[in-house]
Amino acid sequence: MLNMYEEFPFWYTLFTEAGFDVKLSSESDFHRYEQALGSVMSDNICFPAKLVHSHIQELDDMLASGADDVQKFIFMPYVVFEPMDDSRNTNSYNCPIVSAYSDVIRSAMKLKNDVISPVINFRDEKLLQKQICNFLKGYGINKKEANMAFAEAQDAQHSYVTDIQQKAEQILAQSRRDGQLTILLAGRPYHTDPLIQHKLSEMIAALGVNVISDDIVRGNLSVGAGDTCLVRQWAYMNRLIKAGQWCAEQPFDVHYVQMTSFGCGPDSFIQDEIRIIMKKHGKPFTLLKIDDVSNIGSLKLRVRSLIESLSEQKQGEGEHKKQSEKSIKATGEQQKGAYKLPPVKRHILAPYFTEYLTPVVPPLCRLFGWDVEVMPQSDAESAELGLKYANNEVCYPATLIVGDFVKALKSGRYDIDNVSLVMSQTGGQCRATNYTALIRRAIDANGFSNVPLITIGVATQMGEDYGEEDNLDVPWLKMAPIIATSLLYGDVISKMYHGAVSRLKAEARRPEDKFANQAEQLREHYLTAVAEPILRNKPSEIMDLISEAALAFDAITDDKEIPAVGIVGEIFLKFSPFAHQFLAQRIIEKGFEVVPPLLTPFFLQEFVNAIAQKNMGLKSSKMPDFVLKSIYQLIWRRQKKMNALASKFRYYRPFTNIFEEAEAAKGVVSFAAQFGEGWLLPSDIISMVNQGVNNVASLQPFGCIANHIVSK
């Protein structure tokens, strides 16, 4: 199942050396798969994830029929990091589904046995050893025995990796001696499952072509890491891109074919990158999409056509090499001409995010010395342009943001020689880290390759350093009071507006000027008024505005109890009115109170995450927990003061303590779920329920790999 295809030699050796009796589920079977489909919670999740349910059900039945006097459990490790086998990569994450699907299994399936999922970090051997010793200690294995088992397991895994790499090299060498074609059949480790890949490797071999896997490039630093715009964050993705680069540089007797599962989030990003690599070297890129279909006739036909085509093209190897050299040279010249001046001297365009953040961003950035303009919110043209210039399988927020930037640059409103774009980079396992690559490709395709794209890190997810040249370093510490107060202010105004707009007095419901009612008018007034205190760097004046706003909103509000609907979900989708098709407004028009999503918890969760990363063995840190908690207490003190001031509005819903919210979510998902909204999404729901909100809408884009876990 999922990551077990990659590390089974390690786990089998570890458990057997520690005295466990290891039982393995049977080979994947379509009949058992169909029997377990009823517990699958997402129709558009990838086939390998759906298949997990049948394996878990079989293991549960197997253990239930065994002896009752022994300790039994189903082992499904929560592997966040794979080994970092190439120092040129940024990180070695698994995708959220591979890491965290055990959380979904426990929620979706009624099992007789426990599913045990220790958090695992294969990237750092010392931390891994500590994790293993702590895990085995719970089963009565002392440290000495655990260390011995760990050493044997590491040796077994190393031997396995070396063996499959050498086997691929041997097959290639023999293939060349025999003058035969070789196909590098690339995919995730779970694509070795015959049911998942529909025996593609055997199908190709039966046509007289030798097959090797992407394992041939494992740990080989003499192979290029891959010419790509992407942040190299996912372990499997890194290997696929590297294998594509290696294959592109080989003679025309080696070709690249990639298997991908429908709904694979990372592949929607990397397939275009590998296609570009192949095109530069004059080689075809073949992508085979596979799913749980039983009729694979069309797949066989495509494979046969591919092999026949490659056999004919092999004679044109010299011509392809010439095209390759020309393409690489042109690309290199374009990169040398890229803009390198400090972005601070340019007009900076930022994407629209939420109506409660947009008015705060320009004055905050002016305080830092930046000239930032927030673009208008997305519209139908944004969606159309995003679909045109980004892969159609990327997540919906990426489509809109790409479209927004392209639309702005093509509008003719800006001096292209004096404009930059800025985009946040969240880090972690979510695809949002690589939105910048999509934006870069899209604006280049429209002739704006000289426009710099600036990235701002908004999280400290497990210590990434992206090493970008065009970065803006936000002075978080120096400006912390005004930044925190400004962001919290936006959330406070949102709480007041949504608490008031469905309870307006009769006279307050009348349209006035351009506003539909007085609640909208007050919202606009107080979101505009905050600019001056921000520019003066006066957090205390912002606090005064909160007190004033509370009285103003209260004055237009009737005493009225109405049902409430909370909104949670993917961060862009739940905030952007166009992205969620104005859902919040429609709920308000039906007479319900909307309990709005808040922005500040997304940042404040980092205090919990940093402590959790250290305690779970995902990150080394010498900073004591009390230091982080003390820093948070300064913010919490500000939040409590805001609560006191804003409580003059009778329907104000106060901020809650982020550590208390995290504690409430502990039994729902692992704290290692730090992708997307992570554990914050279930904690938001729990917090709303505790406030008496019994209706919650969870908004997620189709195919969101983070929300496949946390929202389900």
Identify what each model region corresponds to:
Residues 1-712:
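An N-terminal assembly and electron-transfer interface module characteristic of large anaerobic redox
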